[in-house]
Amino acid sequence: GFGSLFKFLGKKVLK
């Protein structure tokens, strides 16, 4: 799902 991708990207961006 798209949500999964966003969560993965968000985690990378947050760090």
From Swiss-Prot:
Keywords: Secreted, Toxin
Subcellular location: Secreted
GO cellular component, one term: extracellular region
Biological processes annotated in GO: defense response to bacterium
Molecular function GO terms recorded: toxin activity
Tissue/organ expression: Expressed by the venom gland.
Pfam family, one: Cu
Protein family membership: Belongs to the cationic peptide 04 (cupiennin) family. 03 subfamily.
Name of this protein: Short cationic peptide-1d
